Amino acid sequence: MSTIEATHGWLQSTLSADQTQRRAAEEALKQSEFAAEHVVHLFRIAADTSVAVDVALRQAAAIRMKTVISRGWDSADGKAALSAADKAAVRDNLVEAMVVAVPVVRTQLGLCLRSIAQIDYPGNWPGLLPAICANMQQQNTERVYGALFALRMLVKVYEFRKEAERAPLHAAVEQTWPLMAQLVEMLIATPSVEGAELALLAMKVFWSATQISLPPLLLRPEQLAVLLLAENRTPTPTLTLTLP
């Protein structure tokens, strides 16, 4: 049975210069992929601030977690390898983890969110959008950034979907667009490098949401104009970060 201590040790050994030790750790992690609570242990090591580990180990845990989710969330025969309890634990805490994670970990958690949303959203993940919206309204820049990043990962699920499959995207736009427009207006009023990065990420959400067609809300000229006009008035930062 996998424990968080054992998982921590295996991950640490995968970073070892000793090839034999690395291979043994990789094999142990592979054998434990779908063991009860293993994905939760990986999640905690990656994102739980009460677990004292360095960034390299958090990143390794997040990458391993992404692999486990891609292999075990929904198998080819329709039977998931991961337990319902473990999946619920990940879903219930993923957005919160993303808003507090360091960037290299947040990126991997975002890919986890995207993989899960492709299977579970919206029916089995009703709390996802409310969690994103709640964090978009916070005064903390990191929380807002994490929420926007989570939103982009969700929207990308529907980026190239047929119109008949885009109803969840339309619902997400209806709920988040007013918050996003309000956020960009606020960022313009108090320009900064961090604010420009948030505005850029908001535009990436918009880009992903409008690849195939405009969601119904954005067919209204006054709604579409809000973000576009705001972006035209956003000052270019002296430093920009590379966003996925």
Q: Where do the language-model regions lie?
A:
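Karyopherin-beta/Importin-beta family HEAT-repeat alpha-solenoid scaffold
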Residues: 1-244
